[in-house]
A protein has these predicted regions:
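Acidic/polar, compositionally biased interaction segments
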Residues: 1-168
């Protein structure tokens, strides 16, 4: 990334419940998630090195519009977690030092989610702590803006928060 930047978070997290999960989302430019050192989600823009060189399994959903992504939301492969914490690595980056955006959502297999008027499930944001009241209000404004202006949506749920484990 010539004039860009890349942020990397690595730590231990515990899922809210055992079972199978998958990530949904999109980023302009780069978004990559690994669980226990195995890539499970690549939600980068079409011209990202992550998408073109790493070959992480990904499915595009153009019928689910998302921000400025012609490919719509991307989904990763299902992964299973138990009671023990797992290592998570999140990479997010921008290549041109201009504006950036991204969204990372998490789906639990078997749960049902409220849907938008165009049929997109409102999967919860991937969170490691529940937002404070002011942050919740800002997220609600963002959700409404997304639904009315640029499509895409999400939910915020206490039941979907992944807990950061000590030692992270």
């Amino acid at each position: 990334m010539e004039n860009g930047w890349l942020a990397w978070y690595s730590g231990q997290v515990k899922a809210p419940k055992t079972g199978r999960y998958r990530f949904w989302g999109y980023a302009d430019n780069n978004l990559l998630v690994a669980i226990d050192r195995k890539p499970v989600f690549e939600g980068s823009r079409y011209d990202s090195h992550f998408q073109n060189e790493l070959k992480v399994p990904r499915k595009n959903h153009p019928f689910l519009p998302c921000l400025n992504a012609r490919a719509g939301f991307a989904s990763g492969k299902w992964f299973k977690v138990g009671d023990a914490p797992v290592r998570i690595d999140l990479l997010f980056g921008e290549t041109s030092m201009t504006m950036t955006s991204g969204i990372l959502l998490i789906e639990y297999q078997g749960d049902s989610y409220e849907k938008t008027y165009w049929g997109q499930p409102k999967w919860p944001l991937f969170l490691t702590e529940f937002p404070q009241e002011k942050q919740l209000a800002e997220l609600d404004e963002l959700r409404i803006h997304m639904e009315e202006k640029i499509k895409g949506s999400f939910s915020v749920s206490r039941d979907s928060v992944w807990q950061v484990s000590s030692g992270s």
